[in-house]
Amino acid sequence: NGPNGKSQSIIVGPWGDRVTN
């Protein structure tokens, strides 16, 4: 969950963060 967005879920935030469900 960082500015890199290396997860596989919904993208959140203007930085393109992805949170895992």
From Swiss-Prot:
Protein name as catalogued: Agglutinin beta-1 chain
Biased composition (Polar residues): 1-10
Origin superkingdom: Eukaryota
Function: D-galactose-specific lectin, binds the T-antigen structure Gal-beta1,3-GalNAc.
Entry similarity comment: Belongs to the jacalin lectin family.
Species per Swiss-Prot/TrEMBL record: Maclura pomifera (Osage orange)
Keywords: Lectin
Record region (Disordered): 1-21
GO-annotated molecular function: carbohydrate binding
Oligomeric form and interacting partners: Formed of four alpha chains and four beta chains.
Keyword Nucleus: no
